[in-house]
């Protein structure tokens, strides 16, 4: 867009534009004189939560029967090979197929094209340096990325949420029901770290530096589409505000947000286009290698057994969860909960980068995701929303209750989901 387009005047309550972002607020999040460095405090909370999750996982492993991935009571290394971790190992040993496997009906079967290459490549590099086997190296990569994600989220959101509240948020995310995934050979931790870094840089108006990080995020997990959508929505909002098409009352929905200058809007637009292009790299690579334009999407839908139909899976799966007649009620409740969360002032106060990311990712899940039991794991990219929770739940007792609820959720998720077959319960009323 033309650099000469002037931004509209700020509403009376809005602060003046500041290209440095929230550096003044970030300074207020620094520890007082004599206190430990901020990073040490964040890593201390992260380490305590991560260690607790590891202890719970090792206790649960003792009750795990024989599984497709190993014998009963698996060791730590065997435990790391569960579920999708094996697909990443196959990428290194077998690569990506040039011919998509198909069943007797011609439908594409599950294969490695569904998994992005960044995690196995980093794990291979780690193995070459440390000599560790793949699953140990991949877990080490995830653990490192997990720590980086905690630091990145805190640096990005502590200036908005408050220093102490940010530590609570770190504890809530790393004590959430699916927190074990952040230390296993899954790409969730890597994707979260890169997404937080890219959005945090965009929040500070450093769009050029954010570009390569956003591209790496697109090669870690299928995160490129919602990331580009979030950035695009943010740019459209800024453009509409600059042209005076957004009433002051509507602008107040994102309190404290500093409007972008014309040059910054151009930078955000460039980052949006770059991220959108990066999101297409992996589907294009699958097309180039296999000769099938739909190689990536056909592979992704192999897990659901049907073609990609936006929004349709939520209609059908809601009945799978609670029954055909209660399904619409469940879906309505989920939509209402998502709307209430996005409408909360605490989340809106985190700034446009955080709010548009959460909105874009929720829309992405509703449009393209098949809500199986993996839905809980795939909510982890909404981690920035945890920085709004301390403002909604005030007082140590309420926050401690949230924390305890997350730990209880871990007990259930580890024993019922990760440790396949550990618990066999026949419910009675």
Q: Where do the protein language model's features map onto the residues?
A:
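Short acidic/glycine- and proline-prone juxtamembrane loop motifs at membrane-interface regions
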Residues: 184-190, 375-376
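Signature aromatic-anchored transmembrane alpha helix within multi-pass, membrane-resident enzymes
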Residues: 272-276, 395-423
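Transmembrane-helix motifs of polytopic, lipid-linked glycan transferases
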Residues: 125, 137-160, 340-343
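Membrane-interface alpha helices of multi-pass inner-membrane proteins
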Residues: 195-200, 208-235, 277, 362
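Transmembrane-helix signature of polytopic, membrane-embedded enzymes
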Residues: 133-136, 153-175, 193, 209, ...
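Membrane-lumen/periplasm interface segments of specific transmembrane helices
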Residues: 49-65, 228-341, 345-358
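Short hydrophobic/aromatic helix or loop-helix immediately within or flanking a transmembrane segment
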Residues: 83-101, 105-131, 310-314
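Specific aromatic-rich, kink-prone transmembrane helix
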Residues: 152, 172-175, 190-209, 228, ...
């Amino acid at each position: 867009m033309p650099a000469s387009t002037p931004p509209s005047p700020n509403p009376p309550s809005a602060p003046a534009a500041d290209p440095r972002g929230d550096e003044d607020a970030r300074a207020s999040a620094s520890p007082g004189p004599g206190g430990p460095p901020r990073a040490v405090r964040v890593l201390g909370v992260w380490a305590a939560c991560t260690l607790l999750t590891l202890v719970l996982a090792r206790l649960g492993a003792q009750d795990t029967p024989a599984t497709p991935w190993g014998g009963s009571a698996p060791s730590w290394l065997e435990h790391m090979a569960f579920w999708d971790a094996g697909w990443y190992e196959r990428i290194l040993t077998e690569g990506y197929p040039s011919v998509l496997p198909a069943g007797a009906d011609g439908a594409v079967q599950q294969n490695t094209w569904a998994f992005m290459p960044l995690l196995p490549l980093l794990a291979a590099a780690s193995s070459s340096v440390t000599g560790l086997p793949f699953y140990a190296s991949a877990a080490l990569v995830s653990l490192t990325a997990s720590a980086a994600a905690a630091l990145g989220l805190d640096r990005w959101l502590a200036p908005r949420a408050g220093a102490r509240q940010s530590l609570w948020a770190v504890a809530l995310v790393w004590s959430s029901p699916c927190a074990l995934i952040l230390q296993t050979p899954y790409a969730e931790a890597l994707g979260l770290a890169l997404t937080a870094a890219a959005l945090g840089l965009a929040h500070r108006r450093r769009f050029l530096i954010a570009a390569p990080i956003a591209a790496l995020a697109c090669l870690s997990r299928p995160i490129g589409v919602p990331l580009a959508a979030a950035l695009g929505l943010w740019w459209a909002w800024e453009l509409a505000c600059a042209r005076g098409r957004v009433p002051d009352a509507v602008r107040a929905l994102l309190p404290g947000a500093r409007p972008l200058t014309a040059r910054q809007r151009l930078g955000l637009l460039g980052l949006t286009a770059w991220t959108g292009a990066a999101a297409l790299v992996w589907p294009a690579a699958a097309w180039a290698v296999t000769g099938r334009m739909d190689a990536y999407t056909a592979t992704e839908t192999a897990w659901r057994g049907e073609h990609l139909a936006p929004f349709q899976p939520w209609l059908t799966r809601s009945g799978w969860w609670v029954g055909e007649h209660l399904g619409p009620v469940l879906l309505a409740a989920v939509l209402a909960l998502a709307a209430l969360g996005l409408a909360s002032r605490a989340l809106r106060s985190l700034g446009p980068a955080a709010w548009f990311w959460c909105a874009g990712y929720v829309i992405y899940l509703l449009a393209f995701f098949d809500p199986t039991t993996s839905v809980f794991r795939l909510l982890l990219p909404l981690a920035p929303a945890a920085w709004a929770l301390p403002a909604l739940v005030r007082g140590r007792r309420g926050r401690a209750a949230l924390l305890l609820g997350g730990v209880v959720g871990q007990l259930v998720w580890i024993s019922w989901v990760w440790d396949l077959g550990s618990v066999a319960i026949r419910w009675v009323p």
